[in-house]
Amino acid sequence: MDTRFHCVYLLTSLDPQCEGDFYIGYSVNPLRRLRQHNGELVNGARRTGRRGRPWTIVCCVSGFPDDRTALKFEWCWQHPTASARLRHTIDILTGLRRLPYAVATLHLLVRASLFCQLDLTLHIFESAFLQEAAARAEVFLARRRGAFAVGGGLQAESPRVGTQQHSQRSSSLQGQADGVVTPPLPALDSQGELQGASTAAALATTTAASHLLPPLTPSLLLHVENTTREAFEDAYLSHDRCLLLPSAGMGVVVGEAGKEDSHMSASAGTSCPYDVSLLSQAARAEWSNASFASDSDDEDTRRLAPYCPSAGSSTPSPQRVRTAASPALLGYRSEERAGDGVWEASPGSSVGCGAALRSFSSPPPPRESSPRSASRPPVCTGINASASLAVDAPHGDVTAACPSSPAAAPAPQPRIPLRFADYGEVDFARAHAEEQHRLHHGLLPCSLCALPLQPSCLVYCSRAPFCTLRCHLSCLAMWMLYAEAEAAATIDGTDKSPALLSHAPPAPISPLRRLIPSQPCPCPLCGVLLHWGSLVKELKKRVVVERRLHAVQRRIRMEQRWQARLAHIEPTKRSTGAAMRRRQRARVGAAAALAKGAGKVPGAASTVPAPTMHAGPARRDAPRVSSPISFGEPTLTSFAAAASCPSPSASLAALSPTSASPISRHNGHSNTVTATHTAAAAAAASDASLLSLTDFCEEDWLLP
């Protein structure tokens, strides 16, 4: 699965001599690509290297599922006259040049048949450039249609000027009757430019007066946001500071609230991809105006007071918690109002959920007399009216991006389930942790086929976690295709029931068979419209977020283990060093005691003959080395003193072969006892000297 960030960007030149020049390109990191175009980094484009520097980024379009789709968008934007998507509508822009031409092409391209089904996001960096270019394109189109002023008077370029003037007079009269004054179009010179100093106010007035271009208004599949380079980098390009990743302060330590689930709740606050604080606030805001009154007939049943329809309509969607998109309902429609005014949860609302979304304060039980359906809640009445919900209405020759009228929307407004009324941040984090635990153990079934789900291959509803729809990607595609076929059969007016279609001969399999839904479909559980492009985009976004969350958790665990290891090593080093020094002093003291017990007095020669042993010819002919006592050299006491000194030079001097020879000559014989004790003392002194030096270095490193 390709989870990279694909975008197509638009650059314009800041050079006064190249005003209006633009460049269109594709990149996975547009800010780095901008630095390459400006010469700060290598591998820039040839067109931007000759002239036009410095360049600035005006806007970019993201949300493409893969690089092929993004490259198609780039090629269509660069070659609109040769593109099959725009060749029939680009004729209206003939004669328009420079940046206004690129912006006008963008207005048409986002509504093309291929790209209007994708969940795209328009990131605007320089709104002034974009608005001015769009206004100039509007003025150009108004001039092409004959409604422009040259020298203060109207001039017709087509035989329909009379009809246009009549329509202008009618519109002006209608505006005066409605109390709205329609401002006139600004005057143009013979070159098609504005007379005098073109101000942003005049261009904005012209744009507001007549929308000849399809506007870039936010919709369900087109999101528009004004951002800066820093915010854009933090949100989409930085892996460590990505706004898709919940912040460290957002994490909830669930183990403090529930000790029984400490094995899975220790990291639930940092592993939840949702903003748990936003979810809890949305649930409280949804049920803040709802009050319960006890019923005199049944004290176990609580009646919901009249609910304000506009109470929770301004809560943002959890899938776009970090963006400036238009607010959306955190909807859910699995709880139906019965005839007696009691809200009861349908059995289908717990499909694929189980204990993952179980509230601590469970909703009140329904009355015994209240009817309860035994199957999933029926889909809204308008499931077959998908054409009226989101049909691509033509805008001239351009396909509009799924406009929907309020009358076509479902009558009942989706709501948050009652069990989430008392949910807090800890509850949402624990529910997500339990759901992930069931998912990785194969215990979470699909909501459509009931087969176990696998990680990273399931689709959630756009209102998750308030909607419990969890299903395979292929199952949802089949559901949406079946809904499209049913809607097409209803629109045609022919009787094409599933029973009749089952007896029909199977259609031949062809590579041109469409397997990807093109029309939105209501959710089987909550009734919210689901768009295929939006679902795929959210799936990839969730995969990226989960990977980054796992990486963050792994880094946190490694740091914790490293700190614990260091904390265990520090006292161990200190205690080990002290014990080694004590053992060293004990060895030196024992060697000195043995030497004194053998009768060796410092500064005096040995007069008692020691037991001798005859050596062979080789030993007899070997060179003899004088005893250190005969030359007045320091004895074992000096070795002990050298062992206590950390200086390596003194230790080496004490262990030199000329001054510390363990063999003494007495009447042609060797004193083996003295040699043995002296060798042991020399070894102890050598070990003591090196250990002293090592301990000194360790303490030096361990100093604060």
From Swiss-Prot:
Its annotated compartments are: Nucleus
Q: Which GO terms describe its molecular function?
A: 5'-flap endonuclease activity; zinc ion binding
Which Gene Ontology cellular-component terms appear in the entry?
A: Slx1-Slx4 complex
User: Do you know which Gene3D superfamilies this protein is assigned to?
Assistant: GIY-YIG endonuclease (3.40.1440.10), Zinc/RING finger domain, C3HC4 (zinc finger) (3.30.40.10)
Q: Which cofactor does it need?
A: a divalent metal cation
SLX1-type zinc finger positions in the chain?
A: 446-526
Q: What is this protein called?
A: Structure-specific endonuclease subunit SLX1 homolog
**Highest classification ranks of the organism:** Eukaryota, Discoba, Euglenozoa, Kinetoplastea, Metakinetoplastina
